Amino acid sequence: VLSDLFLIRHGQPVHDPSIPYHTHPGPALSEHGRGEAAQAAEFLTGREVEHLFVSPFARTSQTAEVLAERLGLPVTFTALAQEHAPGEPFEQVRRRVRELLGAAEDSPYRRIAIVSHGSPIRAALLELSNEKIDLSRHVYSGGNPAPTCGIWHVQFLDAYTRRFELVFKPS
């Protein structure tokens, strides 16, 4: 039974206008982004995360690589966690994320991290809270619900109760 879910936004990517941001593979992590990922790994040390589900984009897979290496975690790449595609309705992102959350809940793991992007993280928070979460105090660059390598912790307290907290922001 899933007890803890960590929603991790990718680290800061390289800013290169010639690389489309919202289509696969997108930009790679910058050196700063790699440092953010290392800080996130440090934060997660001792939190007993058992598995990473990861968007296949360059910036998310490189963030996950740092986490997996430092924490010794297995990784599952899934398009369900990928970036909000150009022209993709947000409801479609929510459907994808709903399927991803179902897979996480059906997995044998109790503590899972998902390395994704701002829009799917917003969709996950809305899904898991039945749209009751107030994200108005959590608006970061690009309108995202977390800064780069920010981590939301969702605790599953019982079948109906969940606690949400933005627990980590890199320095």
List the model feature ranges, each with a label.
Residues 2-77, 84, 88-94:
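Active-site-proximal alpha-helix that buttresses catalytic centers in soluble enzyme cores
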Residues 5, 110-118:
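Generic beta-sheet signal
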Residues 13, 120-121:
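Short active-site segment of divalent metal-dependent hydrolases/proteases
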Residues 43, 70, 103, 127-131:
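Active-site catalytic microenvironments for nucleophilic, acid-base chemistry
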Residues 46-48, 104-110:
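Glycine-rich phosphate-binding loop signature in dinucleotide/nucleotide-binding domains
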Residues 55-57, 80, 115-119:
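Short, well-ordered beta-to-alpha junction loops that form the rim of enzyme active sites
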Residues 131-163:
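Domain-level recognition of soluble alpha/beta enzyme cores
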Residues 164-171:
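Short, solvent-exposed aromatic-acidic interface loops
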